[in-house]
């Protein structure tokens, strides 16, 4: 269905490639919309239907219909496969194997953007057995997927709890006005790019990792480099700000406090050596949750958005006392450790599923 999306009408839902969750391959109901125009039954998703992305970077992404998802119409960039002679979940599970994604990588290669048409999808070899055996295997995998979905929900709820605690505590506590410049001495870093990374060498952080790898607090360094000449090293308690993005100004406000000394810092970022009058960990939480929109107003640019220290140094902040900052930081660090434990459990469950899929569908 090549229809535009409109506000959800309460009955008819519209599933597009972006509505299929990357992690769970389920329909995400965070932003429900309806298809605009005349609704055609041949685009209605039914039991035993699998939807497959046919073009773009998401080629190969799949979704298996669930009755609980309601009345769904699928968009034109999705292909529907109706599985009637085999267990749909058994077939769907094979679309999450390394074998499948290797096949997608080869089959989707185009001179332009990647894509796979319906005839090509039908050529992917599916392993089958008796319907009774397929149903048993599908039941096991379904239970594991449900557990993974529950684990994702636990992590999501813990993150929401953290945000709520930060915001509610901030609302209730007494605050004093300071400027960004009062927080400590700022510093710039050297040039360091992805090409400078190596398997071994000195621990380092490049600015892109502030978006993709690290959260509010950096306790373990993931990257290394052999480029050491003239580079700036971290001090424990430094607050690191990325200074450019192509997304939006709000997402640019994503600083991290580093709890490790002598780490090479490089790329499009700046830092602040936080004064002992402030808790660097609390400040990281504060900027990521409370002052994000406030500082985003100082960012400049359209295609590439920039933020420099000089843009924000005079910005006014309302902060709790150091005693309150220390108390709050301790609570939030403990909550982050709980999130980390749950994320490790999620990784174990995901690895278990991958192992089972590999053993069953080599």
PLM feature spans:
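Short, ligand-facing micro-motifs at secondary-structure edges
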Residues: 2, 20-32, 50-74, 88-93, ...
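Short, solvent-exposed linear patches
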Residues: 133-136, 326-327
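Short amphipathic coiled-coil heptad-repeat segments
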Residues: 143-146, 150-180, 344-362
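Short, surface-exposed secondary-structure boundary micro-motifs
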Residues: 56, 140-142, 146, 245, ...
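Sequence-specific dsDNA recognition surfaces
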Residues: 1-4, 18-49, 65, 181-194, ...
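Non-catalytic DNA-recognition/assembly elements of restriction-modification systems
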Residues: 1, 123, 127-131, 168-191, ...
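A short glycine-rich beta-alpha junction/loop motif
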Residues: 72-77, 109-132, 262-268, 300-323
């Amino acid at each position: 269905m090549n229809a535009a999306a409109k506000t959800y009408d309460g009955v008819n839902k519209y599933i597009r490639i972006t509505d299929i969750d990357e992690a769970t391959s389920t329909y995400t109901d965070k932003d429900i919309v309806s298809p605009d125009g005349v609704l055609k039954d041949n685009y209605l998703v039914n039991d035993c239907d699998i939807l497959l992305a046919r073009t773009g970077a998401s080629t190969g992404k799949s979704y298996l219909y669930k009755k609980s998802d309601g009345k769904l119409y699928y968009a034109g960039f999705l292909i529907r496969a109706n599985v009637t002679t085999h267990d749909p979940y058994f077939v769907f599970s094979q679309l999450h194997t390394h074998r499948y994604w290797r096949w997608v990588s080869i089959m989707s290669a185009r001179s332009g953007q990647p894509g796979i048409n319906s005839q090509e999808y039908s050529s992917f070899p599916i392993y089958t057995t008796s319907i009774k055996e397929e149903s048993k295997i599908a039941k096991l995998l379904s239970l594991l997927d449900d557990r993974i979905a529950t684990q994702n929900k636990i992590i999501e709820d813990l993150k929401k709890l953290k945000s709520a605690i930060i915001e509610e505590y901030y609302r209730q506590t007494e605050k004093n006005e300071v400027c960004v410049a009062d927080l400590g001495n700022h510093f710039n870093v050297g040039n360091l790019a992805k090409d400078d990374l190596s398997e071994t060498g000195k621990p380092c952080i490049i600015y892109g990792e502030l978006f993709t790898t690290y959260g509010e607090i950096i306790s373990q360094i993931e990257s290394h480099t052999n480029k050491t000449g003239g580079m700036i090293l971290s001090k424990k308690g430094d607050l690191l700000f990325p200074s450019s993005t192509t997304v939006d100004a709000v997402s640019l406000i994503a600083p991290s406090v580093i709890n490790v000394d002598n780490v090479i810092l490089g790329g499009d970022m700046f830092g602040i050596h936080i004064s002992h009058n402030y808790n660097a960990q609390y400040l990281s939480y504060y900027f990521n949750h409370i002052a994000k929109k406030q500082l985003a107003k100082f960012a400049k640019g359209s295609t590439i958005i920039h933020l420099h220290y000089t843009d924000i140094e005079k910005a006014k902040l309302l902060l709790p006392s150091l005693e309150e900052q220390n108390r709050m930081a301790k609570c939030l660090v403990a909550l982050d450790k709980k999130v980390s434990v749950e994320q490790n459990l999620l990784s174990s469950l995901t690895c278990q599923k991958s192992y089972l899929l590999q053993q069953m569908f080599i």
